From Swiss-Prot:
Subunit structure: Heterodimer of SbcC and SbcD.
Protein name according to UniProt: Nuclease SbcCD subunit D
GO biological process: DNA recombination; DNA repair; DNA replication; SOS response
Induction of expression: Induced by ciprofloxacin and up-regulated by LexA.
CDD domains: MPP_Mre11_N
Pfam families on file: Metallophos, SbcD_C
Family named by the database record: Belongs to the SbcD family.
Assigned keywords, A-Z: DNA damage, DNA recombination, DNA repair, DNA replication, Endonuclease, Exonuclease, Hydrolase, Nuclease, SOS response
Alphabetized Gene3D superfamilies for the sequence: 3.60.21.10
A molecular function GO annotation: DNA binding
Gene: sbcD
Chain's role: SbcCD cleaves DNA hairpin structures. These structures can inhibit DNA replication and are intermediates in certain DNA recombination reactions. The complex acts as a 3'->5' double strand exonuclease that can open hairpins. It also has a 5' single-strand endonuclease activity. Is probably part of the SOS regulon and involved in DNA recombination and repair.
Organism: Staphylococcus aureus (strain NCTC 8325 / PS 47)
Length: 373
């Protein structure tokens, strides 16, 4: 049996003001073409299909087109669960009749009680749920963390699980120790959101969504597919794609398959003048770029200048302020007020104070000293 594991499409994502629908349409077209080659028995999408609970019309159409090609044209069964970014009601609309085409949409965590059987494999679905939802359902005020809530959910099906069959869990959560990135919205506020690996011992394999790094954790049976695209500059350089999972005679193996995006996220560090004069290495001028540059404080609008050469510049950080704090603290402690101001101005502008500026500052300092006296 061949299973394709994917998650975290985040359709409709906007990165630093840039709409990523073109990039998402490109990668989904590539994914569909790959599925024609793979001919899987089933595709699993482990949550966060959309980036917001109220996706745009274009994002909805993009999902419909991709799912339509995979499920209706290629006749591939699909299991979808909701993630913390998805609107449950919208994602679940029409789910009952979609099942006639083997498109299974699960948005309620209680669906773990009704596994989906495909080719002798039991797929248990555990969509994203808040701690309060699980606490309310079980009528148990002692449930205060995701660890406690997820444990309780799994305990309800443990007595009924068929140990002679292959049992796979599909969920959307954070496993303790998993690598996170800036684009992952926290699952909870004020409580511990991670879940220990031991909770999943009764399953033969676990397919997860939420963390965007495909190798977020090192485990033989608990796996994240990672996101289809890089969605924050903390993910720059990360490979993105999907997992191919095979089951032969009860033995489960998986391999990560990378996909090449239309554009990647890239971080460029250096001197402003070197970047403007194209003396630094950039993999692709059309990539989404975050520049971290020094010696640019004298430039009126550096972002506009950068975009004339690198049109997809999305972020700019002034690195002029990066200096050794300990050494400077020692030096500053030995300086008078005027010298400190001169040093600070130099760090910000890379220039010396003019005579007029110095006189004005000295007058201000003298006036303040007289007030203290």
């Amino acid at each position: 049996m061949k299973i394709i594991h994917t998650a975290d499409w985040h359709l409709g994502k906007i990165l630093n003001g840039k709409q990523l629908l073109e990039d998402q349409a490109y990668i989904l077209d590539m994914f569909v073409e790959k599925m024609k080659e793979e001919e899987p028995d089933i595709i699993v999408i482990a949550g966060d299909l959309y980036d917001t609970t109220y996706p745009s019309k274009d994002a909805i159409m993009l999902l419909e087109q991709a799912i339509g090609k995979l499920n209706l044209e290629l006749r591939i069964p699909i299991i979808i669960i909701s993630g913390n970014h998805d609107g449950k009601e919208r994602l679940n609309y029409g789910a009952s009749w979609f099942e006639h085409n083997q498109l299974f949409i699960r948005t309620d965590f209680t669906s773990i009680n009704s596994p989906i059987e495909i080719n002798g494999v039991n797929f248990y679905t555990l969509p994203y749920a808040t701690v309060s939802e699980m606490k309310h359902y079980f009528e148990d005020d002692t449930i205060e963390t995701h660890q406690q809530g997820i444990t309780r959910c799994i305990e309800t099906i443990a007595p009924e699980i068929d140990e002679d069959a292959v049992n796979i869990l599909i969920s959307h959560l954070t496993v303790q120790g998993g690598k996170t990135s800036d684009s992952e919205r926290p699952l909870t506020i004020g409580t511990v959101e991670s879940v220990q690996k031991g909770v999943f011992d009764i399953f033969d394999y676990v397919m997860l969504g939420h963390l965007h790094h495909p190798f977020s954790i090192e485990d033989d049976k608990i796996k994240y597919s990672g996101s289809l695209l890089q969605y924050s500059f903390s993910e720059a350089g990360q490979a993105k794609g999907y997992r191919r999972v095979t089951i032969n005679d009860g033995i489960i193996n998986d391999v990560f398959i990378p996909l090449k995006p239309l554009r990647q996220l890239e971080i460029i560090s250096g001197e402003y003048n070197d970047v403007i004069n194209e003396k630094v290495h950039v993999k692709n001028k059309d990539n989404y770029l975050h520049f971290k540059l020094k010696n640019m404080s004298h430039i009126t609008d550096p972002m506009m200048s950068l975009k004339q050469i690198y049109p997809n510049t999305l972020a700019l950080t002034n690195e002029t302020f990066n200096y050794n704090e300990e050494n400077n603290a020692i030096e500053i402690s030995e300086k008078d007020d005027m010298s400190i101001i001169e040093m600070f101005y130099k760090h910000i502008t890379d220039k010396e104070l003019s005579d007029i500026q110095s006189k004005k500052i000295k007058n201000i300092l003298e006036n303040e000293l007289r007030k203290e006296d």
